[in-house]
């Protein structure tokens, strides 16, 4: 029976479901009259975190009986295939064939973000290779930890109360610049990857620079970071050297989110809940006509001043910066002043290669080693040459993702 299945999957559902799916389930259950308005608002408004909302929601549905549970399961399978795969669910009446078999060596995901894509892009993404993330066995985790624990960032396991968060900001539509065709594929693929790595993913689209700043500050203030071990920030937009273009950018309207603003919002002073935890910034910045430019680099003025300091002054300055700005790494789609390439049908080359390498090596390699492998995949230039680069790196330890752990 469906209620028995939900009881068995309750704990995994609470740990795995994202905000978007919780809200979608609430709407569906209200429409199907499984929940009334008061019950829906109680779940939504009286619980602070996504996990609390998920717990209240599934418990309320289980109490409603098998038919309510069947509607609940059917909506998950239709609206969030990734979650359905994670829970090993299938739609249809619940019987002995309800649970699906799953490869123990890899998890094959179908992105919930595909539901929001145009039909033609959704069909294209689904017809291509599925996103397959190699998992890390407990034995491998134990071996790596024994060998390298002194130089590793502490990682919280899924069995702990871990609330990893990630934020994707993608500008596709602009008032004065060309549409970034193919960006929908990047959003879907990156969301699936980060969810597979254990992050609850927020996606924000088509924002001005001010909107981006507001969203970043709100994300930095999230209490879940206190019980997390890391975060990912992904930016995809048109860009110039000075920063990320907002949707109103033009030659006359400097609607740009400066790079330094991102680091300031998430530094130790402004985001203490992420102190001593890896903060990974992924940047795919595009120019018009399916081309892009990477703009992030150290300020030449700062570099010049640093080189002229006396040793004692330099030491003081370094200590201060280590406390305020630490544990960051920004991985950009190309070196400064060179273009990045994006297909209008399959998405950005950089995002595609990054995802492929994380899928293949996150179970055994630390993040900086994976980024090196991404650069290696671009080593032989062709007509669409670009070279990804890591910038403003202040990671002091190795960061292992250990997917599945």
Swiss-Prot record:
Catalytic activities: Strict requirement for an Asp residue at position P1 and has a preferred cleavage sequence of Tyr-Val-Ala-Asp-|-
Descriptive protein name: Caspase-1
Organism, scientific name: Equus caballus
Residue ranges the record assigns to the propeptide: 1-119, 299-317
Family matches, as Pfam families: CARD (PF00619), Peptidase_C14 (PF00656)
Subcellular compartments: Cytoplasm; Cell membrane
PROSITE patterns: CARD, CASPASE_CYS, CASPASE_HIS, CASPASE_P10, CASPASE_P20
PANTHER family: CASPASE RECRUITMENT DOMAIN-CONTAINING PROTEIN 18 (PTHR47901), CASPASE-1 (PTHR47901:SF3)
Modification after translation: The two subunits are derived from the precursor sequence by an autocatalytic mechanism. Ubiquitinated via 'Lys-11'-linked polyubiquitination. Deubiquitinated by USP8.
GO cellular component, one term: IPAF inflammasome complex
Keywords assigned: Apoptosis, Cell membrane, Cytoplasm, Hydrolase, Membrane, Phosphoprotein, Protease, Thiol protease, Ubl conjugation, Zymogen
Record-annotated CARD domain positions: 1-91
Active site: 238, 286
């Amino acid at each position: 029976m469906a209620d028995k299945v939900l009881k068995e999957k309750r704990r995994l559902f609470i740990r795995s479901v994202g905000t978007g799916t919780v809200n979608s389930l609430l709407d569906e259950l209200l429409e199907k009259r499984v929940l009334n308005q008061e019950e829906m608002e109680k779940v939504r408004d009286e619980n602070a975190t996504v996990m609390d909302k998920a717990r209240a929601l599934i418990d309320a549905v289980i109490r409603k009986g098998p038919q309510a549970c069947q509607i609940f399961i059917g909506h998950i399978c239709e609206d969030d295939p990734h979650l359905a795969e994670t829970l090993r669910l299938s739609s249809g009446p619940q019987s002995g064939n309800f649970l699906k078999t799953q490869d123990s060596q890899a998890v094959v995901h179908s992105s919930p973000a595909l539901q929001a894509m145009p039909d033609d892009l959704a069909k294209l993404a689904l017809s291509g290779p599925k996103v397959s993330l190699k998992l890390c066995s407990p034995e491998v985790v134990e071996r790596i930890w024994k060998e390298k624990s002194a130089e590793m960032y502490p990682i919280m396991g899924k069995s702990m109360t871990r609330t990893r968060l990630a934020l994707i900001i993608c500008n596709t539509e602009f008032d004065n610049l060309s549409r970034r065709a193919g960006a929908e594929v990047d959003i879907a693929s990156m969301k699936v990857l980060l969810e597979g790595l254990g992050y609850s993913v927020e996606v924000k689209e088509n924002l001005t620079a001010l909107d981006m700043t507001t969203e970043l500050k709100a994300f930095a203030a999230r209490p879940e970071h206190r019980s997390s071990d890391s975060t990912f920030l992904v930016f995809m937009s048109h860009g110039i050297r000075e920063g990320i273009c907002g949707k109103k950018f033009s030659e006359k309207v400097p609607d740009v989110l400066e790079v330094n603003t991102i680091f300031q919002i998430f530094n130790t002073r402004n985001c203490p809940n992420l102190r001593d935890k890896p903060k990974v910034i992924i940047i795919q910045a595009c120019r018009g006509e399916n081309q892009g430019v990477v703009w992030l680099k150290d300020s030449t003025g700062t570099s010049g001043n640093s080189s002229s300091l006396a040793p004692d002054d330099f030491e003081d300055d370094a200590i201060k910066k280590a406390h305020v700005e630490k544990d960051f790494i920004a991985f950009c789609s190309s070196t400064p002043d060179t273009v990045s390439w994006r297909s209008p049908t399959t998405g950005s080359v950089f995002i595609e290669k990054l995802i492929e390498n994380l899928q293949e090596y996150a179970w055994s390699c630390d993040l900086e080693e994976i980024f090196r492998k991404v650069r290696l995949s671009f080593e032989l230039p062709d007509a669409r040459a670009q070279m990804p680069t890591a910038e403003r790196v202040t990671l002091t330890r190795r960061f292992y993702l250990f997917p599945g752990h």
